A protein has these predicted regions:
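N-terminal secretory signal peptides and thylakoid transit peptides that target proteins
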Residues: 3-14
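Carbohydrate-interacting regions of secretory-pathway proteins
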Residues: 25-248
């Protein structure tokens, strides 16, 4: 038999095998993470669709450090994209600063838990909450701060209240969101807008003056600053799928 037909059959077989392999390869490379969130394995600060950047990813805390220090305080850990602590420790702050931004994350606390996420924080004071505004994280049903709506879950801590009945019970995951565009800021919890305000306006100025924050002249004044995660309260805290994007 001539060698030419054999060569033609071999070439056809190789071509068919290559075409069959393409869908499988495409499926592996194009897999998307659920809910549009950045996959947990993505490196911190790697931009994803829509300009989102993951702040907690894989087993890395590369985007974070301790308040007024370059190292990560003991007591914080991140495993498979979940940041956690089980005891009181020093606060974390983001290495980057943000002015106008949108921040999303999921969180849960142990029974009686109390924590917070700060934004536009600076480091001239002993604590970040003396300069940065706080989105309160709380087990409303069991923590003392749950007795006041001004210090309940989702509140603009000490200034603007959050309604009752939105936060989930202890040890269940909540979804939170902050939108900050210039003076306008919104706090969201589990798909519901809980509070919004205009920073530096007359109402805001009056509320700050009537609060404990009046003792710190720089409180809430920065247009740009660090994000922070409160660690100084006892108890369990877990955060996952935390991501941020700049707004224009």
């Amino acid at each position: 038999m001539s060698a030419e037909p054999s060569r033609r059959r071999l070439a056809a077989a190789l071509l068919a095998a290559g075409l069959l392999a393409l869908p499988a390869c495409a499926g592996r490379q194009g897999a998307a993470s659920p809910h549009g969130m950045a996959p947990n394995g993505m490196a911190p600060n790697a931009a994803s669709a829509g300009g989102w950047r993951p702040l907690v990813a894989g087993n890395s805390l590369a985007g974070w450090r301790g308040y007024q220090t370059d190292s990560v305080p003991g007591g914080w850990a991140v495993v498979d994209g979940v940041l956690s602590k089980t005891r009181g420790t020093r606060d974390l702050v983001s290495r980057d600063e943000y002015g106008d931004f949108e921040l999303e994350w999921e969180w849960k606390l142990g029974t009686g838990g109390n924590s917070g996420v700060f934004y536009r924080g600076t480091e001239e004071y002993d604590h970040i909450y003396w300069s940065g505004t706080e989105y309160q994280l709380l087990d409303d049903a069991n923590a003392p701060d749950g007795r006041s709506r001004l210090t309940a879950a989702g509140a603009v801590y000490g200034l603007y209240p959050a309604p009752a009945g939105v936060v989930k019970p202890a040890n269940e995951w909540n979804t939170s969101r902050i939108v900050a565009r210039g003076a306008h800021v919104e706090h969201w919890l589990n798909g519901r807008k809980l509070a919004e305000y205009e920073a530096w306006g007359p109402d805001w100025e009056a509320k700050v003056k009537a609060s404990k924050f009046a003792a710190w002249p720089h409180y809430g004044r920065a247009r740009r600053g660090h994000l922070g995660i409160q660690g100084d309260h006892r108890g369990d805290l877990a955060i996952r799928n935390m991501r941020v994007r700049g707004l224009q």
